[in-house]
Amino acid sequence: PGMYIGSTGERGLHHLVYEIVDNAIDEALAGYCDHIEVKILKDNIIQVTDNGRGIPVDIQADTGLPAVTVVYTILHAGGKFGGENSGYKVAGGLHGVGASVVNACSEWLTVNVRRDGKEYEQTFRRGDPDGDLKCIGTVAEGVTGTRVTFKPDPEMFKDTTVYDFDTLEKRLREESFLNAGVKITLTDERQLYTPVLEDGQEGDPCYRSEVMCYEGGIKSFVTYLGEKRKLEVLHPNVIYLKGQTDRGVAEIALQYNSSYNELLLSFANNVNTPDGGTHEEGFKASLTRVFNDYGRSHGLLKDKDENLSGADVREGLICVISVKLQEAEFEGQTKAKLGNTEIRTLVSNMVYSKLMEFFEENPGV
């Protein structure tokens, strides 16, 4: 399992949730889902519900099994292979293995599908079907979606099977920033807690819950990161750049503040790439070039002055880079670094032309 989810420790345990959420996010990216609900139930059981189309239940010719059964039992069966015709142009789930790996890492898993006016259910134990897919009732016309409920296997996750609310919240908040307008709700139903109200009084006991939805997308993300760190911004509006080719889409939001630190977060198909990669390289090279070229052409840098370095121009910068690609190439199974060479060119060209244009139009910045 470590090959697919990174570890069988705490990180891998939480990765199971992200894999199922990524499937729902793929429905959102395709335009079919706008609400994803994640619950931590008693005994650290996880439930993820989306209002997407619902995983198909029709029998597949090559296996003789319902599509949903195949998705949860066969590696690489997800609809994520082959761009245009796979059902998804871009997808964040781990190489299409997500659902079946989560199933294999669970003591039990139940999937409920609502589509075509009916609700279907199937349960699995340690990855194998525990009975066939059944129709368990009807739903109102137009009601669709998928609900996955699973209990991580304690024989596999020997360190811990206890979920941490804050860890899940951080990741799900990232997902909501990266997918503008998608609402993600996280609720902890393991125990009640007593909230402290604004006037200092205690409120009624309730489950801890966070609702995350950002119409501003990654611009809101940059604002959030600055406010969280109580930073003094040097220009009021976040700069937003977007570029697109037939290979993918790149979005960048950036803002400078009075600190000396650089904070750069990058994502490819909604997956954080902490080790950077070609999207970061393209951005950094172009940002430095823009500052030097603009500085020289406007007399801010004199002939005798040395060029500004990359470290100089990224001082006090908060930046979020998000690229969405049909075929993302990650280095290492845990996707820490992006390898697509064509994205370096896309990001580099976009940053240079659009940022140069921005500075010409906003010399005050």
Labelled PLM ranges:
Residues 44-67, 78-215:
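GHKL-type ATPase core
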Residues 310-365:
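Extended, well-ordered alpha-helical scaffold/bundle regions in very large, multi-domain proteins
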Residues 1, 41-42, 139-149, 254-268:
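Flexible hinge/switch segments at interdomain interfaces of large molecular machines
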Residues 3-8, 24-37, 78-91, 111-113, ...:
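Active-site phosphate-binding and catalytic loops of NTP-dependent enzymes
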Residues 10-35, 98-105:
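Conserved ATP-binding N-box helix of the HATPase_c
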Residues 132, 166, 174, 181, ...:
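GHKL/Histidine-kinase-like ATPase module
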Residues 7-10, 58-63, 279, 310:
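Conserved, non-catalytic sequence blocks in retroelement Pol enzymes and Pol-derived host proteins
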Residues 1-18, 70, 84:
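Bergerat-fold GHKL ATPase/HATPase_c domain
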